């Protein structure tokens, strides 16, 4: 029996009433995963035995009636450390790495008796927008297997969209949760920078990275964010703000709420079908009582250039630790120490990772630091100021999550600039450290279109309020791909 059409609240009710056990739910979820995995390719590792053992432990002590996540399985992106489960970052460099510790976010999952059922495929070290740079496999879009699932959290998104799991964790450095959520027609939240501990997340861009939830519905997303949020002394960038219940405002009306629609978000490069869908979604929010007005974010057009200087610079520093000496892959082709360093990194990293290391090393090098990295930091400040000006008068910003729907597999592999531009609408949110969500807003030629809602720092509750109001009065989130039993 499959339970993948049951909401988290419904599953919790069944578990509390003992109509199903955590073990039965876990086994059913594993059946759904294996039945769809060949078609979608969401997972690098499926931890059958460990997940069932966890579920049996939870059954033995009993489901906690006050904990909606008790006994619920989920997928975790493979750049988030999981003790006893391979954590590869989809790289040859870490193809056999089994951590001896859990990331803080994973510790919080276990504290709520959640079950990590497997590790989701991704772009290598989270560098990519299509999940095609993975060392292990390519993941297919849940709606059309000839399309990409987005990236870098493509496996996490496809697993939810295809009905393999209800929930997953991803990470977002420049859109890596929101863009695949858009491409697969699910909900994906990039929280405020500092909202979720980065301890145990393999670092890509340390001033940009955030772990976040991916889900079938807005409420489930808020429920999972409530679990993983909170201060962590092991992450100096994590916020000390008290974490409440992110579902608190769900169900409240949005009458009188002011929402900005930047003209740059519907300009050049936005596919006509995507633009039409977002305009329709904005009008729907107006019918619900929101006030939608056009604004300008004039420096957002520089976001991609700024991002690829800053993120690549941070990556070149973070990835220095992978040298063939301490852990991970080591070349067998060496005569001296220099050979170990050079050949290990040449053989262990894929082309996209090496490209970004070179970009970052160049940007930080003597004679170029001021011209590139320092200037990028200055423009980043201008992008932040643009958002601050808008949020002085508006509650939220809306726009498309991505300029297009999911593109063909292998279509942009040899055009990195075109691939980078796919994140033009999500990158500024990371540069400013803001929270942003993608929710299903419609379809263009049979493929999902996501609407992005962006708020000031620590405004996740308000974002969920508006997202849930839209979701409750539309049926886009209820439509499913064929692999999940839908008609599309």
Curated annotation (Swiss-Prot):
It holds the Pfam family Amidase. PANTHER family: GLUTAMYL-TRNA(GLN) AMIDOTRANSFERASE SUBUNIT A, TRANSAMIDASE. InterPro entries: Amidase, Amidase_CS, Amidase_dom, AS_sf, GatA. Belongs to the amidase family. GatA subfamily. The keyword Ligase applies. It catalyses: L-glutamyl-tRNA(Gln) + L-glutamine + ATP + H2O = L-glutaminyl-tRNA(Gln) + L-glutamate + ADP + phosphate + H(+). GO terms for cellular component: glutamyl-tRNA(Gln) amidotransferase complex. Allows the formation of correctly charged Gln-tRNA(Gln) through the transamidation of misacylated Glu-tRNA(Gln) in organisms which lack glutaminyl-tRNA synthetase. The reaction takes place in the presence of glutamine and ATP through an activated gamma-phospho-Glu-tRNA(Gln). Keywords: ATP-binding, Ligase, Nucleotide-binding, Protein biosynthesis. PROSITE patterns: AMIDASES. Coiled coil: none annotated. It comes from the Bacteria. GO terms for molecular function: ATP binding; glutaminyl-tRNA synthase (glutamine-hydrolyzing) activity. Heterotrimer of A, B and C subunits. This is Glutamyl-tRNA(Gln) amidotransferase subunit A. GO terms for biological process: translation. The active site is at 77 (charge relay system), 152 (charge relay system), 176 (acyl-ester intermediate). Its EC number is 6.3.5.7. It is an enzyme of class 6 (ligase). The keyword Translocase does not apply.
């Amino acid at each position: 029996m499959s339970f993948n059409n049951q909401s988290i609240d419904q599953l919790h009710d069944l578990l509390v009433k003992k109509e199903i056990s955590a073990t039965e739910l876990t086994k059913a979820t594993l059946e759904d995963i294996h039945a769809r995995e060949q078609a979608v390719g969401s997972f690098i590792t499926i931890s059958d035995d460990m997940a069932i053992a966890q579920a049996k432990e939870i059954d033995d002590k009993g489901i906690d009636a006050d904990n909606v996540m008790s006994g619920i399985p989920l997928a975790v992106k493979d750049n988030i450390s999981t003790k006893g489960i391979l954590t590869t970052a989809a790289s040859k460099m870490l193809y056999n790495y089994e951590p001896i510790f859990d990331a803080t976010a994973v510790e919080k999952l276990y504290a709520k008796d959640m079950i990590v059922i497997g590790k989701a495929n991704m772009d290598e070290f989270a560098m990519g927008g299509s999940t095609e740079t993975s060392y292990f496999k390519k993941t297919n879009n849940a709606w059309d297997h000839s399309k990409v699932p987005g990236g870098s959290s493509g496996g996490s998104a496809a697993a939810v969209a295809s009905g393999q799991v209800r929930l997953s964790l991803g990470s977002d450095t420049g859109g890596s949760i929101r863009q695949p959520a858009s491409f697969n027609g699910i909900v994906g939240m990039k929280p405020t920078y500092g909202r979720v501990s980065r301890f145990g997340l393999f670092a890509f861009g340390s001033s940009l990275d955030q772990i976040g939830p991916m889900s079938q519905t807005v409420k489930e997303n808020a429920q999972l964010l409530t679990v993983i949020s909170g201060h962590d002394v092991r992450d100096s960038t994590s916020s000390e703000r008290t974490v409440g219940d992110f579902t608190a405002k769900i169900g409240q009306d949005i009458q009188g709420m002011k929402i900005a629609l930047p003209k740059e978000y519907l300009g050049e490069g936005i596919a006509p079908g995507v633009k039409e869908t977002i305009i329709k979604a904005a009008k729907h929010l107006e019918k619900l009582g929101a006030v939608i007005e056009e604004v300008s974010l004039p420096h957002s057009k520089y976001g991609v250039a700024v991002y690829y200087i800053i993120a690549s610079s941070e990556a070149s520093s973070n990835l220095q630790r992978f040298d063939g000496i301490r852990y991970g892959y080591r070349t067998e082709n060496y005569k001296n120490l220099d050979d170990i360093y050079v050949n290990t990194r040449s053989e262990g990293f894929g082309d996209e990772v090496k490209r970004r290391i070179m970009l970052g090393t160049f940007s930080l090098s003597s004679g170029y630091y001021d011209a590139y990295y320092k200037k990028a930091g200055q423009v980043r400040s201008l992008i932040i100021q643009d958002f601050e000006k808008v949020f002085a008068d508006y509650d939220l910003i809306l726009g498309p999550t991505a300029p297009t729907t999911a593109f063909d597999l292998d279509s942009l592999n040899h055009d990195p600039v075109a691939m980078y531009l796919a994140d033009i609408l999500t990158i500024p949110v990371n540069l400013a450290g803001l929270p942003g969500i993608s929710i299903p807003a419609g379809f263009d030629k049979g493929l999902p279109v996501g609407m992005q809602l962006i708020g000031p720092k620590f405004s996740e509750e308000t974002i969920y309020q508006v997202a849930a109001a839209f979701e409750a009065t539309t049926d886009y989130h209820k439509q499913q791909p064929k692999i999940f039993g839908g008609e599309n």
